[in-house]
Amino acid sequence: MGIPLGVDAPQHDVSSVDDVLALVRESGGRVTNSRRLLLEAIFDDPGHHSAENLAVLVQARAPDVHLSTIYRNLEELERLGVVVHSHLGHGPATYHLAASAHCHFVCEHCGSAVKAPDELFVSLADRAKKEFGFTIDTHHFSIFGRCRNCQ
């Protein structure tokens, strides 16, 4: 999972849409068509997606699903510890599976974002914990600079 998350949401070992739907049921939630389609979109392309992008993917299969429904479902999935959001620059928050916790390098010039290897931050996380009692939330940890192409 990488360096410590420092978030209160539980982390669940979910590897499929059906695993998440079982978790939703266990938590007393409803399994709706829009929730299933959203999960399929996330699992089909487990990268970073804005809520708007996910809405487009879901609406391609169910045009009546509104953006507000996507946001409500993402909020519930985040509460369950299935997805997390990250802020990669000045754009909207992006969502990805919680099991893929990682830090980001974000280019301030072109806006590109790449996954940063957790190993780069282990000593920082250890030191922050040891010296300050602070646990780094890797889902929200981005380092801004200039990418190779923009230098």
Give the role of each language-model region.
Residues 1-13:
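Short, intrinsically disordered or compositionally biased N-terminal tails of bacterial proteins
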Residues 31-33, 44-50:
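Short capping segments at the starts of secondary-structure elements
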Residues 53-59, 70:
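A short acidic, leucine-rich amphipathic alpha-helix
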Residues 79-151:
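Non-DNA-binding regulatory cores of transcription-related proteins
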